Amino acid sequence: MELRTIRITAIGDELLAGHGDPRGLGWFGRVMARTQDPALRLQSFVLASPAEGSEALAERWLGEASRRFSDQYENRLVIALSDRDVDLDVTTARSRLNLANILDSASQMNIKALLVGPAPGLDDARNQRVAELNRVYSDVALRRNHHYVDTFTPLRSHAQWRADLNASGGVPGQAGYGLMAWLVLHRGWYSWLELPEPGEG
């Protein structure tokens, strides 16, 4: 049986790279470690840039990601969206346009994208603005038929998430990244890869 080879290129900010995780895995490393199928060979490439908003991401993603794509394999794109536009005072209309441009380019290249939305912080007032950003990002993705994993809503009031941020200087630690990985794995990861859910079949 010929192996399927999927090349996953992931773009995003420092949370994608596992910043603050003592194990150095982050949520993406945990997700990849859990994705096992005897008929599948996965190749992953992490392209993280700290403190990056949607405009900078839109400017750099194609030049960096396209070097990892190959006509010989199935190419997939993970977009780990940050909350940075809130701090940069980017309007939601501009955030929407930046993400739409990324997804439209990916669609033109027949690349299926999975988006992971921004995670909540500890500041409730700031979280209100991140909630709106999350809503906008989700709308853009779903209108274009790409998978969107909402991490903000389930984690906003999650006691373990907030405790982990408090203990780790405002960034996730092992527990926080584990929660993010669980959400990704259980909210569309396997269907996006066209794989059976674990335990099926």
Predicted segments, located by residue:
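Serine-esterase "nucleophile elbow" of acetyl-processing enzymes
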Residues: 1-50, 62-72
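Structural motif
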Residues: 7, 75-78, 112
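Cell-envelope and extracellular/periplasmic
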Residues: 15, 47-52, 79-86, 142
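Oxyanion-hole/transition-state-stabilizing segment in secreted/luminal serine hydrolases
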Residues: 21-24, 54-96, 121
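A general structural detector for well-ordered alpha-helical segments in enzyme core domains, enriched
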Residues: 27, 31, 64, 95-102, ...
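Glycine-rich phosphate-binding loop signature in dinucleotide/nucleotide-binding domains
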Residues: 67-74, 109-110, 191-193
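Active-site segments of SGNH/GDSL-like serine hydrolases
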Residues: 80-84, 102-134
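Catalytic His-Asp segment of secreted/periplasmic serine-dependent ester chemistry enzymes
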Residues: 120-201
